[in-house]
A protein has these predicted regions:
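Fe-S-dependent hydro-lyases/dehydratases of central metabolism
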Residues: 1-726
Length: 726
């Protein structure tokens, strides 16, 4: 038998990764070049602006830009459409693919037009997952896409691979979200699959239609895994055939002897209808468990909310229980996970000849692309939904990130979308608002709608699903999508709106580093939605200074003011007018202001779960942030964002208590030499407000050679500027 390392090479995962590793070796590190890239309208402006400042000439690989987030253009005057116009001009200038507003959500366009078996796609969205179609997808912050645009690589340690073994077949009423929520619940808290690749196989795969597989696959992001891949079969071949790309299919199977670092077994026969309660997809129960003990379970959610928000909000979920039944206020079926043809078809079957009624409960459905929307219209699905009282809306990611269908205060929305993080649905706790999202499968949402808003498992009702299989019509994309790859026109002028601004100046690290704590968060996990809110805030994504005004605004409202004060004092220091208090603090550790960087710092137990959006890090940098300190980073992508924006990703040992407060200082001597010299830790000093000095060991490994230089230079743009001068 081969050794484990030899047999790991026989996984589908390693077959694809090694084929994309420019080093061509079988070592412990990989330098990956991707086949294509995806971005949406929250991220592509910043990526292109960064790439331009770093020497971009043209797009070297297919790069599709979709407009599915701020595509309603409902807030901020012209700024959202200004970004869309910029995107089209960039596609023309540099040779990109431009998908106009509301034609498709980012990941459905990739499934329809971009994926190929054995390929790899990098996306500036955390839910970049196409493994069910034989294409490994990776979600990262914009800096990693910039590297690919400049013909550089995605550098990773060779990952572990976990086998997800599927058996059985789901019964009627069970959908992909039920399986996905169960998977997230099983592995999230333990970190069992963190930064690993999930490889799906087993006899149960053949029993799942493509939309079902896609629905599970897209949610693997919520497990904190690195990527995913599935075995391919006739069902996958059919997907490529109907999308008129049969040449992009090939069979993918592991070798005869393949080694996996772990295994998850899922018996689809036993899958129950699920509900993930606020404030995470892992906070999951079977719907029957909720029905059996609703007051206790909902009271636990209330208590969690009070711990998070204190007296800023008033929450009353238990009032949703009436006569032992739990009532929802809103239902949503949307986005890359929810708005599939099969989900909408089965929801329509459940609601056929039913009514959602005329009371408080409302429901909306968002087909995930225009081809899917056209098929629901052609096949009578839209008619059945509309007759039941469902509002049908365009391909739009709004309900998934707080830019559409924000519920009423204290409202409970059940959604087939990807996340239910705090305030991600759009509520503003600073204004006393709170609304809550529970994740459910489209089938159970439809059953709930048919039952007047009483939360109901679709397995508990009778219905017949008789809709025809999906047929894809390419005409709308042929007519509307700008296909510019290999057709760049460098004479094309980029079109700028008044909100599109360049990045402000960022400084290299000096010999020493003094940090002032501007936020200390002891929540178990801090999401990127808390670090920088989504929703209407993201309309300012192309204006770094204006967007940074919202950093941590829903979790630590005083953070921006503190950071601005720290940044102002650092600028005075750089101008030779160092504030006396900074001189005094440095004197306590025998240092001076001339060779010591000064910036703000965020401490959180486990930051970075959720979105890949680089603004979670860049906004800190724009405000003068120089470091994060934590016990561990929730995801690789957030840590990479920190590095690419020159924020040193410190960690501390798990047995060390971090009992410091905003206004305390952390001094890190010799940090520049430590980073450039290949060291992995530093002996720091905490200077507390009362003058007490405490030792603190900080770790910052692993870092590649390039990442060390990026940190020393202050950010990725500075790094490329320095390279271009050589």
């Amino acid at each position: 038998l081969p050794t484990p390392d030899e047999a790991r090479e026989n996984t589908i995962t390693y077959g694809i990764l090694r084929a994309h590793d420019v080093d061509g070796s079988k070592g412990d590190s990989m330098r990956i070049k991707f086949d294509a890239m995806m971005s949406h309208d929250i991220t592509y402006v910043g990526i292109i602006q960064t790439a331009r400042a770093s020497g971009l000439e043209k797009f070297p690989i297919p790069y599709a830009m979709t407009n599915c987030h701020n595509s309603l253009c409902a807030v901020g005057g012209t700024i959202n459409e200004d970004d869309h116009v910029f995107g089209l001009s960039a596609a023309k200038k540099y040779g990109g693919i431009y998908v106009p507003a509301n034609q498709a959500v980012i990941h459905q366009y990739a499934r329809e037009m971009m994926v190929k078996c054995g390929n790899m796609i990098l996306g500036s969205d955390s839910h970049t997952r196409y493994g069910s179609l034989g294409n490994m997808g990776v979600g990262e912050g914009g800096g990693e896409l910039v590297k690919q645009l400049l013909n550089n690589t995605w550098d990773i340690k060779a990952p572990e691979v976990v086998l997800v073994w599927l058996e059985g077949s789901p019964r009627k009423g069970i959908g992909p979200h039920d399986v996905a929520i169960s998977l997230v619940k099983a592995v999230f808290d333990s970190g069992f699959v963190k930064n690993k690749v999930l490889e799906f196989a087993g006899p149960g795969v053949k029993n799942l239609p493509i939309d079902f597989r896609n629905g599970i696959d897209i949610m693997t992001t919520e497990t904190t895994c690195l990527s995913s891949i599935w075995v391919t079969d006739e069902e996958v071949k059919h997907h490529y055939d109907i999308h008129q790309r049969p040449e992009d299919y090939r069979e993918l199977r592991p070798g005869k002897v393949a080694y996996y670092d772990g295994m998850i077994r899922i018996d689809l026969d036993k899958q129950e209808a699920m509900i993930a309660l606020p404030f995470h997809p892992s906070n999951a129960y079977t719907i029957h468990e909720l029905q059996a003990d609703p007051e206790r379970i909902l009271r636990e959610v209330e208590e969690d909310a009070r711990k998070r928000f204190g007296d800023k909000i008033s929450i009353d979920l238990v009032s949703k229980v009436k006569d032992g039944k739990v009532y929802a206020d809103q239902g949503i079926i949307a986005g890359c996970s929810g708005g599939t043809y099969d989900n909408l078809a089965e929801a329509a079957s459940i609601l056929k000849d039913q009514s959602v009624g005329n009371d408080y409960f409302t429901i909306s459905a968002y087909p995930q692309s225009t081809p899917v929307y056209m098929a629901t219209t052609r096949d009578g699905i839209a008619t059945e939904l509309l007759e039941a009282g469902v509002v049908i809306k365009p391909a739009f990611c709004g309900p998934c990130f707080g830019a559409g269908d924000v519920p009423a205060n204290n409202g409970l929305s059940i959604r087939h979308t990807t996340r239910n993080f705090p305030n991600r649905e759009g509520s503003k706790p600073g204004q006393g608002q709170i609304s809550l999202v529970a994740l459910m499968d489209a089938r159970s949402i439809a059953a709930t709608a048919a039952n007047g808003g009483v939360i109901t498992a679709a397995t508990d009702i009778e219905y017949t699903n008789a809709h025809k299989p999906y047929e894809y019509d390419p005409k709308i994309y042929e007519r509307r999508v700008f296909q510019g790859f290999h057709k760049e026109n460098l004479d094309e002028e980029l079109r700028y709106g008044p909100n599109i601004k360049d990045w402000p100046k960022m400084y290299p690290i000096q010999e020493n580093m003094l940090l002032e704590l501007a936020a200390v968060i002891h929540d178990p996990v801090t999401t990127t939605d808390e670090l920088i809110p989504s929703g209407e805030t993201s309309s300012y994504r192309s204006n770094p200074l204006k967007l940074s005004e919202f950093a941590l605004s829903r979790r630590v409202p005083e953070y921006v003011g503190l950071s601005k004060r720290i940044q102002k004092e650092d600028l005075e220091r750089r101008d030779g007018r160092c504030p006396e208090k900074i001189v005094d603090v440095l004197a306590k550790v025998g240092a001076g202001p001339g060779d010591t960087s000064f910036g703000s710092c965020v401490f959180a137990n486990r930051p970075g779960d959720g979105s890949a959006r680089e603004q979670a890090a860049s906004c800190q940098k724009v405000l003068g942030g120089d470091a994060n300190i934590c016990y561990e980073y929730a995801t690789k992508r957030y840590r990479s964002n920190c590095i690419n924006w020159g924020i040193v990703p410190f960690t501390i040992d798990k047995d060390v208590k971090f009992e410091y407060e905003p206004g305390d200082y952390v001094f890190v001597p010799g940090i520049r030499d430590a980073i450039l010299g290949g060291k992995e830790e530093a002996d720091a000093k905490v200077i507390k407000a009362d003058g007490t000095v405490v030792d603190l060991k900080l770790h910052f490994a692993p870092l590649t050679k390039d990442e060390r230089q990026i940190l020393a230079d202050g950010c990725l743009m500075n790094y490329y500027a320095a390279q271009n001068k050589k």
